[in-house]
Design a protein with these regions (language model features):
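N-terminal accessory targeting/assembly segments
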Residues: 1-112
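Active-site phosphate-binding and catalytic loops of NTP-dependent enzymes
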Residues: 48-57, 102-121, 210, 318-325, ...
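P-loop NTP-binding catalytic core
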Residues: 75-181
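Switch/coupling sub-region of P-loop NTPases
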Residues: 183-185, 201-332
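Conserved lysine of the Walker
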Residues: 195
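NTP-binding/hydrolysis catalytic cores, primarily Walker-type P-loop NTPases
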Residues: 349-431
Length: 431
């Protein structure tokens, strides 16, 4: 537990201090840098994450691929790649480290074992860890770090030089008003595009005393660390099942996101936020959105045009009673906005990764042919980043009620331009 970790960390300080004092008395004092490094290593071993800890404290790292104990591929912010030192002395030791991480995974039970050879959890620093062994050639793990826990729409609009400018001030003001108006928003994009960052910034617009429910497979959005501003959030985490499967085919003790959504509706909140919809939980999520306001979720989709079909694909996994037409009507009634986040990776040509919002689609409803109908309120400009395209229709009055007049975008729509503060600096644009 957390108290045990604190005690182990104190023990590490004591042990290293006594060792440093002993070598000092022997006439060979340790340089301050070496003493600090030794303390980091001893703390990491005692707390249970071993050499993983040195990767977690390095804020320049974005993602780590552990391909066995001795192959550690490190991706840094901006897309640079290098190879790190071995993470363990053997694959068996690596598995022990991963199992130790699973035991410290917080309130919900996680394990990595012969009966459960995959693992998905949040590490103490907020990073996301996925691991697999036995069914793979060697033990593999991926760590996605979250160095930016406290982020606002202002930050995404260029207020912080250390972050990508993902939106411009026009889109910032539109999204801020959309949150005040209680619109239901789906944030879509590829893995690693920045969906979590965008939804964190949107969460920052929720009043600090407003109760809302946050549902995640493993905790990633971290509202309690989100600047400390969300005092009334109720955070739920799915629980993996273990042992024999019941008559419904599910392992004993499993509690899924789909199970938790009906519970959330009884918690007296207007907003429900699902970290990611990836399966049958999309149906209860959309059902909840039809009776709530200001709810949000993220979804994986390759293209903006593919979001609707992705929704249908997931909805059909809910059961035989769900049809394509039902899924479309449900999405058309539940969603107000779809925000698409794009990532363009230019590292192969000596550039970097660029992350930005490229589309904001207003969901109008279900139109001819029973298709989900949308209007591009913001769409790609000359460099791919979102600029105003059309004035919103269905949500216009809701925005007006919170003091946002969308007609302010008219001149920008006519000009086909946005208000981005910094150039994108794409290598492709310079060719």
């Amino acid at each position: 537990g957390e108290e045990e970790d604190v005690e182990r960390a104190r023990l590490a300080v004591t042990v290293v201090a006594e060792y440093a004092d002993a070598v000092r008395r022997a006439g060979t004092p340790m340089p301050a840098g070496e003493e600090r490094l030794l303390l980091d290593q001893v703390t990491a071993e005692l707390v249970g994450l071993g050499r993983l800890q040195t990767l977690l404290v390095d804020t320049s790292i974005e993602e780590v691929h552990i391909l066995g104990c001795d192959r550690v591929r490190i991706t840094r912010h901006g897309g640079g790649v290098d190879w790190g030192e071995p993470i363990a002395d053997s694959d068996a030791e690596l598995v022990e480290i991963l199992q130790a991480a699973a035991r410290r995974a917080g309130a919900t039970e996680r394990s990595l074992s012969t009966s459960k050879p995959t693992l998905d959890l949040q590490l103490p620093d907020g990073s996301r860890l996925a691991a697999v062994f036995l069914v793979s050639q060697r033990p593999y793990a991926v760590i996605r770090k979250h160095n930016t826990l406290d982020v606002s729409l202002d930050d995404l609009a260029g207020a912080r030089a250390d972050l990508d400018e993902m939106i411009d001030p026009l889109l910032r003001d539109f999204l801020r008003a959309s949150m005040r108006a209680g619109l239901n928003i789906m944030v879509a994009g590829l893995a690693g595009a920045g969906k979590t960052t965008v939804i964190r910034a949107l969460m920052g617009e929720i009043p600090p005393d407003e109760p809302f429910v946050l549902l995640e497979e493993s905790r990633e959005l971290l509202p309690t660390q989100h600047g400390g501003r969300h005092r009334a959030v109720m955070s739920f985490e799915a629980r993996e099942g273990h042992g024999e499967r019941g008559l419904d085919g599910r392992p004993a003790g499993e509690v899924s996101i789909a199970d938790l959504i009906p519970v959330s509706l009884r918690m007296g909140v207007l907003r429900i936020i699902v970290g990611e919809v990836r399966s049958r939980e999309i149906v209860p999520m959309l059902q909840a959105m039809t009776t709530s306001r200001g709810s949000m979720c993220t979804i994986h989709a390759r293209t903006p045009a593919g979001v609707g079909e992705r929704i249908i694909e997931l909805a059909l996994s809910h059961g035989r009673e769900m049809t394509v037409d039902q899924a479309r009507r449900m999405a058309g009634n539940a969603l107000d906005l779809i925000v698409y986040v794009t990532v363009e990776d230019e590292t192969a040509i000596g550039g970097r990764k660029h992350r930005f919002v490229s589309h904001v689609e207003e969901v109008i409803g279900v139109g001819d042919g029973n298709r989900i109908t949308t209007t591009a309120v913001f769409g790609p400009g000359p460099d791919g980043r979102a600029v105003p395209r059309h004035l919103p229709e269905r949500i216009r009055d809701q925005l007006l009620r919170v003091g946002y007049d969308a007609r302010l975008l008219s001149r920008w729509v006519e000009a086909g331009a946005g208000a981005w503060r910094r150039p994108r600096n794409s290598r492709l644009a310079r060719r």
